[in-house]
Amino acid sequence: MARRTRNRSEIIARRFVSRQQPTRTQPFVERWRWIIQGQVQGVGFRASCSRRALDMGLKGWVRNLQDGSVEVQAEGPPIALAELRAWCEKGPLGAQVKRVKPCQMPVRGDDWFEVRY
């Protein structure tokens, strides 16, 4: 009986790993959360970030936080995510970004990118 359980565990593990690996029809996807600190509210950060993310084909959302920072959660190909993070480090004209705190998150499968209020 222990052998059957081990084989079943191996099968489940292989199925999980195969779902996480990119295929030719489905590119590798990651999800990242960034907290952007500095003078980032009242300068059009959310709208600009949303346009950039949509142009790059990313999914997720952006919102203001009560402490004056902005939170971005985005998922998509790692190259596009790196481009969005680089943009977040500068922000739109008028923003003064002091710090970007990154955190990798589990992929959720969002359907679009939106501004949250």
Swiss-Prot record:
Keywords: Hydrolase
Molecular function terms from GO: acylphosphatase activity
Signal peptide start and end residues: none
Ranges for domain Acylphosphatase-like: 31-117
Keyword set includes Oxidoreductase: no
Catalytic activity, EC: 3.6.1.7
Protein name, as recorded: Acylphosphatase
Organism: Synechococcus sp. (strain CC9902)
Gene expressing this chain: acyP
